Regions:
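Bacterial N-terminal signal peptides
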Residues: 9-20
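Boundary at the C-terminal end of the N-terminal hydrophobic targeting segment
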Residues: 21-28
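Residue-level "contact hotspot" at macromolecular interaction interfaces
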Residues: 54, 110-113
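Short, structured beta-strand/loop micro-motifs enriched in basic residues and often containing a Trp
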Residues: 36-46, 98-106
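Intrinsically disordered, low-complexity linker/loop segments enriched in Gly/Pro
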Residues: 103-104, 126-180
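A generic structural signal for residues embedded in beta-strands
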Residues: 63, 119-122
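Short, Lys/Arg- and Gly-enriched loop/turn segments at beta-strand edges
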Residues: 68-80, 127-137
C-alpha cells in the first residue's frame, strides 16, 4: 500500500541532548523531499550513496514516497492513467540502477552531527494518501508460496482517504491505521 507525504522529525539524540545541555536553541527548519529520479534508490540502499538531503536534529521533513509498480502494469490492472503519478512515470523511465528489491526508496537523508552508534528518534507526524488505490500482487517464483502459483495476478484496492479504509472486496473494509 502506498503512503505518501510522510512528515518526519529527525532527532540525533546525542546532539540534541548536547545542545539542550549547553542552552543552545538551534533554529529548526522544514524541508520537502520529493520522489524524483535523483532522490530515490530502486530496490536497495547503498551505504556509500550520497545523501539527497542534509538536515539538523529537530528539523522536519515531508517525504514523498511512491507505489512500487510500473505505470504500464498499474494501467493494465485498471488504474486510470491520470491516477498514475508523473513522478512514478519519470522514475520508471529514468532510473536504470535497480537493485534486487522492488521498492522505490526516497533518500537517504543525512543528519548533521549524528555519528555511528547514535540512536536516532524519528517521529512520524502525519500520513496523507497521495493516490486513491493500493495493490497486491504475486507472480511465479515469488512471494511466500512461489511454487504454488505458476501465474501472475494483481489486485487494485480502492482507498477511501476520508474514511481511511481500503475497500478490499464487497463487504470487506480494511482500516488504514499505521502500525506506529
Amino acid at each position: 500500500m502506498k503512503r505518501t507525504n510522510v512528515i518526519l522529525t529527525f532527532f540525533a539524540l546525542s546532539t540534541f541532548a548536547l545542545l539542550t545541555a549547553q542552552g543552545i536553541h538551534a533554529q529548526q527548519a522544514a524541508y520537502t523531499l520529493k520522489a524524483t529520479p535523483k532522490t530515490v534508490a530502486w530496490g536497495y540502499y547503498d551505504a556509500k550513496a550520497a545523501p539527497v538531503l542534509r538536515i539538523k536534529s529537530g528539523d522536519t521533513v515531508q517525504i514523498d514516497t511512491l507505489i512500487t509498480n510500473s505505470p504500464k502494469r498499474l494501467e493494465a490492472a485498471g488504474v486510470p492513467p491520470e491516477q498514475v503519478e508523473q513522478s512514478l512515470r519519470d522514475i520508471t523511465e529514468q532510473v536504470k540502477d535497480k537493485g534486487p528489491g522492488g521498492h522505490i526508496l526516497t533518500g537517504p537523508i543525512y543528519i548533521e552531527g549524528a555519528e555511528i552508534g547514535d540512536v536516532l528518534e524519528v517521529k512520524i507526524l502525519a500520513i496523507k494518501l497521495a493516490i486513491p488505490y493500493a495493490y497486491n500482487a504475486f507472480g511465479p517464483g515469488r512471494g511466500y508460496l512461489p511454487d504454488d502459483y505458476p501465474y501472475a495476478k494483481m489486485k487494485i484496492i480502492p482507498l477511501d482517504a476520508q474514511r481511511m479504509i481500503a475497500n478490499f472486496a464487497p463487504g470487506i473494509e480494511i482500516p488504514l491505521h499505521p502500525f506506529f
